[in-house]
Each structure stands twice: as structure tokens, then as C-alpha cells.
Amino acid sequence: MTINDSAISEQGMCEEEQVARIAWFYYHDGLTQSEISDRLGLTRLKVSRLLEKGHQSGIIRVQINSRFEGCLEYETQLRRQFSLQHVRVIPGLADADVGGRLGIGAAHMLMSLLQPQQMLAIGFGEATMNTLQRLSGFISSQQIRLVTLSGGVGSYMTGIGQLNAACSVNIIPAPLRASSADIARTLKNENCVKDVLLAAQAADVAIVGIGAVSQQDDATIIRSGYISQGEQLMIGRKGAVGDILGYFFDAKGDVVTNIKIHNELIGLPLSALKTIPVRVGVAGGENKAEAIAAAMKGGYINALVTDQDTAAAILRS
């Protein structure tokens, strides 16, 4: 969703000016949406839609001035313990949609990090797609270029499908996992795949989800059919605690060797991911605490968005 800065309304204002005025009346003057609609001669529905556009485009940003916003104490401890560049810990809320709230937190972090026309590399998973859905207007207005970090077009559509048609998206034209290591090697040598992988490694910022072996059936990589339950069991027995982009690592953050899927994946390996300057991990749930800690120890992420309960569990582990 983008702000139309060329169309002039009946009131003689472009859409961006309408958004700015509505935001001022709503947040600074405390007017209701009905009062604003009367003042500007707009329908209440139009006022509501313009407020939403303002949030999605980044014109309107809500800042909560409290030392508890973002759970400052947890953020400080995580930053020090794991040498993180950026941390956002969202307050815990019982029975809330954790994935959606993490997506909002991650979107806010990315809006503060990304500069116009920079490139954002995205990994697959529910957390990253939740984030992408809340960045649509910002990506379009700031001309942010997107590139996927792994194959598997379908895994990205819940996020990419929400973007403006004018957004620049570079997708790896291959599955996430090939049926054999030989086929994976062949596909990765195709120019159309190789070029996207090179673009991904050249990204300014990356955002990835973090899976945990302890999630069992709830893990995205299992629900998406990329590995079987039997494979997950064997991977766990080899000491793996979590994965990023399908690559599994142990509690120390070291990639686990002799795992079949690693040779069949089509995507950026973790060693290449580490060369991207800012690598944001977005994940929540106490059952992911060990995996998130391991991802930070391995240096695969240097920025984190998580929730209060998960942050506490990470610091206890």
C-alpha cells in the first residue's frame, strides 16, 4: 500500500498531506475519527484507511516513551551477553498472537535500519512472512529491493503476495530442497539461481526465522514437508538444536556435519549469511530459547526480535 503524492483531493491536498493532517488531529489533538471526517469533509472509512496507509508507509510511527517499552532490561542483557547490534524484546501478553506481534516488532526494527533503495534478504518461515506483511507500504515508498535467501517459491508467497506490484523482488527459481545432492549442485550452477544467490549475499540487511528441533511437528520445516519426522529425530540425535534456512546447528552454534539435507538445500549457506552486515533473527516461544541462543553464539544473527518470556528463557539457559 503506497501513498499517492501526485493526486490532489477535492480539498486541494495530496494524499500524503491528508495523512499528515489526519495523524496530527488524531494523535496530537485527540480528535476522534468521526470528528476528523467532519473537519476534512471525508468519510470516516476514508479517514481510517488513510491512517492505516500512514502506518504502512512509515509516515506514522508510534513511539511509546517508557523504560518498559521493548523490555529494556532484557534488551540490555541480551545485547551484552551475545554482542548484538540491535535488540527488540516485546512485552509478554497472555493468549496473544505471538507471531503477529513479533512481525510488528521486526517491521519496526527494519524500518529504522533500512535506507532508501537498500536490499533486504529474506528467509522463509511464518515469522519472516508476518514481518513482510507489515512492511508493504514501507518497502514500496522507500524502494527497498527484496531477495530471497532460499529456494521454495511457495514458502514466500504469504508475504510477497501482500506487496505492491511495483516492488522489486528477486526470487530463487528453484525448490528449497532438491531430491539429491547432484541435482542441488546442478541447480546451484544455473546462472538464474547463481545470480540470485550472489544478490542475496550482497544484501544490506537480512531477516531470518529460527527453527527449533524441540518444536517437533510445529516446526516450519516439517509442516512445509522439507524434512520428515524421522529425519528430524535423527538430526536431533546428532546434537542439533535449531536451524536457519534449513541448516542445522548444535548448542554451541556449530553447523552439524553429516546431515543429508545440507547437501540438498538450494539457498545461501550459513557461512555466506554471516557476511551480510545486519542479520535480524525473529523468533519467539520458550521452546526456541536454546536454538535462538545457539544462533547468536554461532554469529548467524547479530540482531534479534523476540518476546519477553523467550528473552527470559534465553538468559536463564
UniProtKB/Swiss-Prot annotation:
Q: Which residues bind DNA?
A: 33-56
Keyword annotations for this protein, in alphabetical order, are:
Activator, Cytoplasm, DNA-binding, Repressor, Transcription, Transcription regulation
Mostly located where? cytoplasm
GO terms classed as biological process: DNA-templated transcription; regulation of DNA-templated transcription initiation; response to heat
What does the annotation give as the result of altering Y26H?
Greatly reduces the DNA binding ability. Retains tetrameric assembly
Q: How is its activity regulated?
A: Inactivated by phosphorylated autoinducer-2 (phospho-AI-2). Phospho-AI-2 acts by binding to LsrR, which is then unable to bind to the promoter regions, allowing the transcription of the target genes. Phospho-AI-2 triggers the disassembly of the tetramer into dimers and reduces the DNA binding ability of LsrR. Dihydroxyacetone phosphate (DHAP) may act as an anti-inducer and inhibit binding of phospho-AI-2 to LsrR, preventing induction of transcription of the lsr operon.
One cellular component term from this protein's GO annotations in UniProt? cytosol
Keyword DNA-binding among UniProt keywords: yes
Q: Give the result of T220A, as annotated.
A: Decreases affinity for phospho-AI-2
Name its cellular compartments.
Cytoplasm
What happens when the protein's gene is inactivated? Deletion of the gene causes a significant increase in expression of the lsr operon and results in accelerated removal of AI-2 from extracellular fluids. Deletion of the gene affects the expression of a number of genes associated with attachment, defense and pathogenicity. It also affects sRNA expression.
Q: Which GO terms describe its molecular function?
A: carbohydrate binding; cis-regulatory region sequence-specific DNA binding; identical protein binding
Outcome (variant: Q33A): Greatly reduces the DNA binding ability. Retains tetrameric assembly
Gene induction: Autorepressed. Part of the lsrRK operon, which is positively regulated by cyclic AMP-cyclic AMP receptor protein (cAMP-CRP) in the absence of glucose and negatively regulated by LsrR.
> Which Pfam families does this one have?
Sugar-bind (PF04198)
Its biological function? Transcriptional regulator that represses the expression of the lsr operon (lsrACDBFG-tam) in the absence of the quorum-sensing signaling molecule autoinducer 2 (AI-2). It also represses the expression of the lsrRK operon. Acts by binding directly to the lsrA and lsrR promoter regions. In the presence of phosphorylated autoinducer-2 (phospho-AI-2), LsrR is inactivated, leading to the transcription of the genes.
Question: Whom does it interact with, and what assembly results?
Answer: Homotetramer. Dimer of dimers. Interaction with phospho-AI-2 triggers the disassembly of the tetramer into dimers.
**Which NCBIfam families does the annotation name?**
PRK15418.1
Q: What is known of its domains?
A: Contains an N-terminal DNA-binding domain and a C-terminal ligand-binding domain, connected by a linker region.
Q: Which family does it belong to?
A: Belongs to the SorC transcriptional regulatory family.
Query: What protein name applies here?
Result: Transcriptional regulator LsrR
State the organism of origin.
Answer: Escherichia coli (strain K12)
